[in-house]
Amino acid sequence: MAKVEAQQQKDDLQEKLIAVNRVSKVVKGGRIFSFTALTVVGDGNGRVGYGYGKAREVPAAIQKAMEKARRNMVTVELNEGTLHHPVKGRHTGSRVYMQPASQGTGIIAGGAMRAVLEVAGVHNVLSKAYGSTNPINIVRATVDALTHMKSPAQVAAKRGLSVEEIRG
């Protein structure tokens, strides 16, 4: 029974492979090559997670990354396929800026950031990456920005006002 539920839960997630990289460890006898994989998973409805896996073979690295991504999922409050307000995120040398966009705009984002936004269920957004464009750091900065986004209900609760007063 538990396996069936886990299989169903896994099936409704979108998975995206962002990057595969060959890395090496230098030892006395030469080099030992291995592979790293960066992946994101999401349900297309506000849940998103990223994973980074490392193994001697590419498929094993991808599988490890997918498992880590499923374990590290966060929930993001979305507003009809876009963001509630402009947000900034940063991780090490990478900084990202994202702002809500009107219906029909699409996802204006590059590379790794686009993959995160697609699996999270964001359909209309304007974004820009500053500083380092290392895919790992961009993914982490994007997830950081999305987790710091507040819905009007959260802001209203914090300020002790109603949602209508917050929206103006």
Swiss-Prot record:
InterPro entries, A to Z: Ribosomal_Su5_D2-typ_SF (IPR020568), Ribosomal_uS5 (IPR000851), Ribosomal_uS5_bac-type (IPR005712), Ribosomal_uS5_C (IPR005324), Ribosomal_uS5_N (IPR013810), Ribosomal_uS5_N_CS (IPR018192), Ribsml_uS5_D2-typ_fold_subgr (IPR014721)
Organism: Shewanella amazonensis (strain ATCC BAA-1098 / SB2B)
Protein name: Small ribosomal subunit protein uS5
GO MF annotation terms: rRNA binding; structural constituent of ribosome
Similarity field: Belongs to the universal ribosomal protein uS5 family.
Primary gene name: rpsE
Purpose: With S4 and S12 plays an important role in translational accuracy. Located at the back of the 30S subunit body where it stabilizes the conformation of the head with respect to the body.
Self-association state and partner proteins as the record states: Part of the 30S ribosomal subunit. Contacts proteins S4 and S8.
Domain annotation S5 DRBM: ranges: 13-76
Superkingdom of source: Bacteria
Transmembrane residue ranges: none
